[in-house]
Regions:
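A conserved beta-strand-loop-helix scaffold within acyl/acetyltransferase catalytic domains
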Residues: 5-142, 158
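Conserved GNAT acetyl-CoA-binding A-motif
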Residues: 1-7, 158-170
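Conserved catalytic-core subdomain
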Residues: 167-183
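Residue-level marker for well-ordered alpha-helical positions
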Residues: 15, 50, 148, 152, ...
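Conserved acetyl-CoA-binding loop-helix of GNAT-fold acetyltransferases
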Residues: 1, 142-156
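A structural signal for short secondary-structure junctions
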Residues: 124-126, 158-165, 178-180
Length: 183
């Protein structure tokens, strides 16, 4: 099996790998869709998201880079378990070990309210591209739209000078299931 490198991760646009697969008469067994924002031509936030940003600000939500991995992992595990009967691909120990090995490339950003982590995401930095994984909020965080404020900060401030912001894939079952809520 081979997974093609997404176009936005190439330093120079190229598809030699796809051509080699064609020559070998390879067949596709899966197809995923990635949601990527070109920050040199950003999309306008939907009105619902802009209202969410205002709601989070008026509630007193703050956003920051954080070392509160255990607090966020608790929010993430609860959310995945209750909504999907699933668990994170990485354990808390694994993700903190990866962060310790690559502190300039793997970061945690959290949204807090009254001193409690109510949401967050893990960010992977690689050249001109930023990719997020493990986007999650508690029930209270969802009520206060903490993720709208978090992504407003990440897209418009923290990573505005990067080229691409990759939200990851929105599929399951090798591409046969599309989670439209992630698009």
């Amino acid at each position: 099996l081979y997974k093609c490198v997404p176009h936005h991760l190439h330093r120079y646009p190229a598809e030699e790998d796809r051509y080699a697969l064609f020559l070998r008469q390879a067949s596709r067994v899966a197809c995923n869709i990635a949601s990527v924002v070109d920050l040199s031509a950003p999309l306008r936030f939907a009105e619902l998201r802009r209202r969410g940003v205002r709601k989070a600000l008026s509630a007193g939500v703050s956003v920051e880079e954080s070392e509160a991995w255990a607090d966020f992992w608790g929010v993430l595990k609860d959310n995945l378990s209750h909504r999907f009967g699933a668990h994170p691909v990485h354990t808390l120990d694994e993700i903190t070990r990866l962060h310790a090995l690559f502190p300039g490339n793997i970061r945690l950003f959290t949204a807090t309210l009254d001193g409690r982590v109510e949401g967050g995401t893990v960010v992977y930095e690689c050249g001109d591209c930023v990719r997020v994984q493990y986007i999650s909020a508690s029930e209270r965080g969802k009520e206060c739209a903490v993720l709208d404020l978090l992504f407003d900060y990440l897209l418009r401030d923290r990573y505005a000078s990067r080229r691409y912001f990759d939200f990851g894939t929105s599929n399951g079952d090798d591409g046969h299931f599309l989670n439209e809520g992630l698009i």
